[in-house]
UniProtKB/Swiss-Prot annotation:
Protein name: Cell surface superoxide dismutase [Cu-Zn] 6
Cofactor: how and how many bound: Binds 1 copper ion per subunit. Binds 1 zinc ion per subunit.
Mode of membrane association: Lipid-anchor; GPI-anchor
GO CC annotation terms, alphabetical: extracellular region; extracellular vesicle; side of membrane
Gene name linked to the record: SOD6
Species of the source: Candida albicans (strain SC5314 / ATCC MYA-2876) (Yeast)
């Protein structure tokens, strides 16, 4: 059959064609973004994803979710390129946020710089429980609206392994009322880390220079043995030329041609990175021991996963 060699060829080409994202060294300290669930899709999925950078450096991500379907994981989650329409249709959010045209096969890349900016589960691990809380920093996300990696106005989407969307929500800048409600949540749960992240006062004269910060978006060397490199990228290349607004559904491009995400069915073990994570059973919105995933099945063969992933990803 010709089909399988073609699959292998597409897989290899996608890996070779990966483009590299810069690390974001400066972010506004006075911006907090949040995706609140439920919004679109399954209304039983509740919680939030909070993005902040109170130190002015990398974006810190705090995920606290509950209500994902039992016995259906592992679950994948990504930032998608468009916001959720008013009718809550998760199919209208477009493809993964991928401003540097990276390969969808994050697991096979040299490092996370070659992954899609929005592929959060590819960079940080998929979820294998129905309720979870975790914290990590992602140096490839930006809260600077001039950056190509700017995430506000886009959406967070949770997927089944076959890429069917479960739930989605807009990433919005938190106003003072929403920020205070987050602080109240973390106060009730004694989450000192998040309280420090959100409740640290700024200097009265604090200002963030959006254009100047672009000069701090740099490529790093791929190997630890190489001397440090700080290759500055031209402002023109980094400047975010999209409007990042919630455009009416009828003005959005068609989403009929969906990209294949072949990594979605790779074995769960392949996704467990060595980087530390703050997985725990306690969640603000639930306790994961009350809703464990029993008997979760994951494809065990990379080649089998590749065939299934292409069949599920290209033609769905």
């Amino acid at each position: 059959m010709i089909f399988i060699p073609i699959i292998i060829l597409i897989y290899l080409v996608s890996i070779a064609a990966s483009d590299k994202s810069p690390k974001i060294k400066k972010n506004p300290r006075n911006v907090v973004a949040v995706a609140d669930f439920p919004f679109g899709g399954d209304t039983q999925v509740k919680g939030n994803v909070v993005f902040s950078a109170k130190e002015g450096k990398h974006v810190n991500v705090h995920i606290d979710m509950t209500g994902l379907p039992k016995d259906e994981g592992p679950f994948f989650y990504h930032i998608h390129e468009r916001s959720v329409p008013g009718n809550g249709n998760c199919e209208a959010v477009g493809l993964h946020f991928n401003p540097y045209n990276a390969s969808p096969v994050c697991d096979e890349q040299k490092n996370d710089a070659y992954c899609q900016v929005g592929d959060l589960s590819g960079k940080h691990g998929c979820i294998n429980t129905t309720c979870f809380e975790l914290k990590y920093s992602d140096p490839y996300l930006s809260l600077n609206r001039k950056s190509k990696s700017y995430i506000i106005g886009k959406s967070v989407v949770f997927h089944y392994p076959n890429l069917t969307k479960i739930a989605c929500a807009d990433i919005e800048e938190a106003n003072e009322l929403r920020l205070q409600s987050l602080i109240d949540e973390y106060t009730q749960t004694d989450d000192a880390i998040q309280l420090k992240e959100l409740n640290t006062p700024l200097e009265t004269d604090y200002k963030f220079d959006e254009v100047e910060a672009l000069s701090s978006e740099i490529y790093h060397s791929d190997t630890d043995s190489d001397p440090p490199q700080q290759e500055l990228i031209s402002t023109e290349k980094l400047y975010n030329k999209t409007d990042n607004v919630y455009s009416p559904e009828e003005t959005r491009p068609s989403d009929q041609n969906k990209k294949s995400h072949r990594h979605s069915l790779l074995p769960l073990a392949k996704w467990k990175k060595n980087s530390p994570k703050n997985y725990s059973n306690i969640s603000i919105h639930g306790i994961s021991s009350d809703c464990l995933n029993d008997g979760m099945m994951v494809t065990g063969s990379v080649f089998g996963s590749l065939v299934l992933g292409i069949a599920a990803g290209i033609f769905v």
